[in-house]
């Protein structure tokens, strides 16, 4: 398993635990204190679990399992995957931190911070999928399908 794959998967697991801690905090306050979580806290929890954990695992496993890039492919370069990883990691962590700060009645400029982090997440995904696009191709499956095999 390559370094980039491990990095995506381990970062996803770290985001899972962040999401679980936020979830434990929310349920404790709701059940023991009667305080329902606000939308910013729910958003921080959702981004930690759904984007931070689920998407990072998907991206890491895709990087691991998809066919190698075609010979002479100029688009796929590990540096671009690194750029996507760091953009997504920093943006997702910033988004979660910003949402948590907003849930605590943080300053108004946090709205711009959260928005910028969200846009950076979109940029990170765009870099990843633009780089990976040539790797989404048949390698042998078109031959099996021609013989009548179905998946």
Predicted segments with their positions:
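Hydrophobic alpha-helical transmembrane segments of multi-pass integral membrane proteins
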Residues: 1-151
């Amino acid at each position: 398993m390559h370094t980039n794959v491990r990095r995506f998967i381990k970062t996803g697991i770290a985001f899972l635990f962040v999401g679980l801690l936020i979830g434990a905090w929310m349920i404790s306050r709701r059940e023991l204190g009667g305080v329902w979580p606000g939308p910013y806290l729910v958003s921080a929890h959702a981004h930690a679990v759904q984007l931070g954990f689920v998407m990072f695992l998907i991206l890491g496993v895709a990087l691991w399992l998809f066919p190698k890039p075609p010979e002479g492919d100029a688009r796929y370069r590990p540096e671009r995957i690194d750029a996507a990883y760091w953009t997504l990691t920093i943006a997702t962590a910033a988004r979660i931190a910003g949402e948590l700060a907003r849930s605590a009645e943080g300053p108004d400029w946090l709205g711009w911070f959260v928005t910028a982090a969200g846009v950076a997440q979109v940029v990170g995904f765009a870099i990843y999928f633009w780089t990976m696009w040539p790797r989404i191709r048949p390698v042998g499956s078109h031959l099996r399908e021609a013989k009548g095999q179905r998946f």
